[in-house]
Each structure stands twice: as structure tokens, then as C-alpha cells.
């Protein structure tokens, strides 16, 4: 492990030198590439340097214990030794995690798609609850959200809502939300007070850059139509809504959120690119995913990952068996406790695999 860490530190120093080179500074592509790589390994390098410093302090403390010391001094050095040993062990564990292979998509912005599934009106209302939850979570993280497409219902739910989340590390956190979310509650329209079970599905796609997925104009059919609101009524008379069909994969994306046809097409292209990129990745990872069943689930969007039980004010994440009696807080966007636990479970599983 120490050899790998030293190699990472050497690379960090090399990148530092390159970023001061006038030839690199004048080359925008190289400058961006080197800056990004340096940022990705910075935490590893800083943690490794702390580890080396603590290791030296530990050696000094051990050497002092071998000298002739009075009782008070001996006790003081012994306490320092214990603290340093504990700190060294913590840093070792952190470094093991930092050396795990990174998901190349973790730093990307994301496109989130929420759809009401089983349960009719109640499922669509729950889809709206999930959108509000993620919107609030994004705000707490300092991320920006932007609605790309929304099919609202007259009751205030969503048949489907697609939105973008822009922010550092958005995919690294939100990727754990992929799957089917189940709600158990008494609908407002239920006179008998019976609990209904409904589901909504969440898809989290990393934003794909143009260089990552090559889509030819000739492969896209563009249709325009008038925007419509809840219930299907027309909300404007201009043909501003856009539907894109990627002919080779039969992937269809619509966008009518903007008044401008050009802006709707730009938003639709982002979703189209992300969906095709996701499809390519899913196919490439299918065989690997079969051999490595993640502790946090397969990521399959049909997999039930979480239940929100209103009568018991309970949220249960089925992938890691975590139950919290904090339903209201979770729906207010306080997802850190759940997502942090999923990250730890994922890292633990990855460490086991690395040690095999």
C-alpha cells in the first residue's frame, strides 16, 4: 500500500510542476485535464502526508519511552503514544478507502427521472414527494436543480418528472437512489382509512459529455408540437415542445418546459445523451455486475430499494437493512444518514473484494 501511496504523491508533485509550466497554462485542454487529475488525488496525498507525520511522531514517542523518565513524564508520553497509535489506525483505514477504484462518473452532474408506477394517483403524488425530497437535499448540498420535463397531474402529482442536478459529486451520492421506492399510507381520498401501497421509480443518470457519446444528427428524428398542461390541455399555441427520437436505439425524449423550442431541444439532447450513455454503460457492466453483487443492491431500477411507511413514521432501506424513525426529516431532504450508510456499505464490499 505504501508504494502505491508514494506513487500517487509523486504524480501529485509532477502535476504541480506541470500546472506551473507556461506551455500547459496556455493549453486550455491540458490545463483542465491536469487540474482535474490533481483535484481527484489531493485528498489521498494530504491524508498520506498526515499518515507519514503521525508515523514519525509515533517513532519519536516510542524512543522517548525507552529513556529514563519520571512517572509523570512517562504517563504523558504513554498517553500520547496511545493517541498516535489510534490516529495512525484511522488514517490507514481512510487510505485503504481512498485507494479503492473510483467510479469515473462520481464527479458528474446527474439527470434524475422519477415516474409514478403502481398505485395510480397515489403513486403520482408520491413521485411529487420524492421530487421535493431530492430538490431539498440538493439545496442542502449547495447543488442547483433544473426541471427538464414534467407531466403534472390535476391532483398535484407527477406521472413523470425529469430534472438535472448540477454540483460537485452529485452522482457519487444520488446514484444510490436508483430503484423502486415504495410508500405505505392512507390516501386523502380513502374514506375507509385503509393503508395503500404504491411505488415510484427513480433513475439516476450521469450527465454525458459530447465527447463521451457520439450521436449523429442523421440518427435523430425531431418532432415539434404544442405544449400541454395537466389533463392534456394546450398551454400555448406555438410549436415550442420538442420530441427527439434516436432511431438506432428507439430512445425517445420529450421536453416542453421552456417557451423556446431551441432551449427545449438543448434540454432534450442532454437527456437523450445521458440515456444512451447509461444504456452503453449498463450493457458493458452487466457481466461484471452479475459476478459482483453489491452490498447496496444491483442498481436495477425495478429493484425495490426503500419503503416509506407513514403510519409508523418509518423509512427502511432494504439493501442494507437500515430503518429510521425519521420519515418527516427524510422527506424534508435530510438524506445524509441513509446515503452515508450506503456509501460505507459499498466501500466495505469493495474492500473485501480488493483483499480477495
From Swiss-Prot:
Q: What the entry says about post-translational processing?
A: Methylated by PrmC. Methylation increases the termination efficiency of RF1.
Could you say which protein family the record assigns here?
Answer: Belongs to the prokaryotic/mitochondrial release factor family.
Task: Spell out the GO cellular component terms annotated for this protein, sorted alphabetically and separated by semicolons.
Answer: cytoplasm
Q: Which gene encodes it?
A: prfA
Lineage top rank: taxon: Bacteria
Stored SMART domains: PCRF
Where can this protein be found?
A: Cytoplasm
* GO molecular function annotation: translation release factor activity, codon specific
Record's keyword annotation contains Aminoacyl-tRNA synthetase: no
Pfam families in the record: PCRF, RF-1
Q: What is its main location?
A: cytoplasm
Q: What is the lineage of its organism?
A: Bacteria, Bacillati, Bacillota, Bacilli, Bacillales
Q: From which source organism is this entry?
A: Shouchella clausii (strain KSM-K16)
**Which keywords has UniProt assigned to this entry?**
Cytoplasm, Methylation, Protein biosynthesis
Residue positions where N5-methylglutamine is found in the record: 233
List, alphabetically, the InterPro entries matched.
Answer: PCRF, Pep_chain_release_fac_I, Pep_chain_release_fac_I_sf, Prokaryotic/Mito_RF, RF-1
Database matches in PANTHER family: LD18447P
The job of this chain, per UniProt, is described as: Peptide chain release factor 1 directs the termination of translation in response to the peptide chain termination codons UAG and UAA.
Name listed for the protein in its UniProt record: Peptide chain release factor 1
Keyword Ribonucleoprotein recorded: no
